[in-house]
């Protein structure tokens, strides 16, 4: 009986620590999701504003080209549909999100030059950098869920090439269109992955997309 009473304070402390860690994890998830939602909305606005400067025929032609082309981030292995996203582990979704955000740190310098808005290069880079730091904290805090990455997960960490800079200056309209379309596409991906990961770590019973 005495041993039981001695263990009770230890168990209570452990419980409080576990609860505190879970609350901090949710706080970080909330911040990360809010930040990527902001970036996704920003990407959508930038893309729509750019499309608004194009002629209808020009817009249709660029859309056809983009559907047949690819984004540089397509080399980062990620779930191809909602079903795969639902099956992916929290840690896998976090690693993919980190890699996608990281892949835009350099192209974002060009991204801000394509638009005449109030967002400067440093602000865009700062938004991406802050989100990357937050996702990295979440990865460290959730390492215990999956001790190590499997072979498929490790493919996401391949070096990132600067595809967008190689499109050339002779076709700036196409280059800017693809840049903005890919940025919007990737921010949507990250928003989806972080939202699913956040739900998995919460008490919500239904995390379907």
UniProtKB/Swiss-Prot annotation:
What molecular function terms (GO) are annotated for this protein? growth hormone activity; growth hormone receptor binding; metal ion binding
Q: Which N-terminal stretch is annotated as signal sequence?
A: 1-22
Which Gene Ontology terms describe the biological processes this protein takes part in?
Answer: animal organ development; growth hormone receptor signaling pathway; positive regulation of growth; positive regulation of receptor signaling pathway via JAK-STAT; response to nutrient levels
Q: Specify the domain of life of the species encoding this protein.
A: Eukaryota
Which residues participate in Zn(2+) binding?
A: 38, 191
The record lists its disulfide bonds as 71-182, 199-207
Show the coiled coil region(s): none
Would I find Disulfide bond among this entry's keywords?
yes
Q: Which InterPro entries match?
A: 4_helix_cytokine-like_core (IPR009079), Somatotropin (IPR034975), Somatotropin/Prolactin (IPR001400), Somatotropin_CS (IPR018116)
Q: Where in the cell is it found?
A: Secreted
**Cell division found in the keyword field:** no
Q: Which UniProt keywords apply?
A: Disulfide bond, Hormone, Metal-binding, Secreted, Signal, Zinc
Q: Name one GO cellular component term.
A: extracellular space
Write one Pfam family the protein is assigned to: Hormone_1
Known function: Growth hormone plays an important role in growth control and is involved in the regulation of several anabolic processes. Implicated as an osmoregulatory substance important for seawater adaptation.
The similarity annotation says: Belongs to the somatotropin/prolactin family.
User: What name goes with this protein?
Assistant: Somatotropin
Q: Which gene encodes it?
A: gh
